[in-house]
A protein has these predicted regions:
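Acidic, low-complexity intrinsically disordered regions
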Residues: 1-100
Length: 100
């Protein structure tokens, strides 16, 4: 049984840089698996990392969190990405669907 962590639209940047933004809560859950993780993106197996980036897009400094993997570049902008931990407890499973 998989554990759904979050759903969010695929950004226009993901296809260019292979980074899919995730919430701080999802990042904390994934970092518990290790900073380098097995990733399954719409059925394509890859290795990825969980990383943060400092940001000043708001008046107070903060961080944005990402899953980074080459397979993420195949995700289509505007689709909804559901990020889960697969039933094996160690693979990050990202599946995209058309928006509702």
């Amino acid at each position: 049984m998989s554990e759904v962590l979050e759903r969010r639209p695929v950004s226009r940047k993901t296809a260019r840089d292979g980074k899919h933004e995730i919430s701080a809560g999802t990042a904390a859950r994934l970092v518990a698996l290790g900073t380098s993780v097995d990733v399954l993106v719409d059925g394509i197996a890859d290795r990825g990392t969980v990383a943060s980036m400092p940001c000043t897009c708001r008046p107070e400094a903060h961080e944005h969190w990402f899953i980074e993997a080459p397979a993420l570049r195949a995700m289509e902008v505007g689709r909804v990405a559901t990020t889960s931990i697969a039933g094996d407890g160690r693979t990050v499973d990202i599946r995209t669907t058309a928006p509702r």
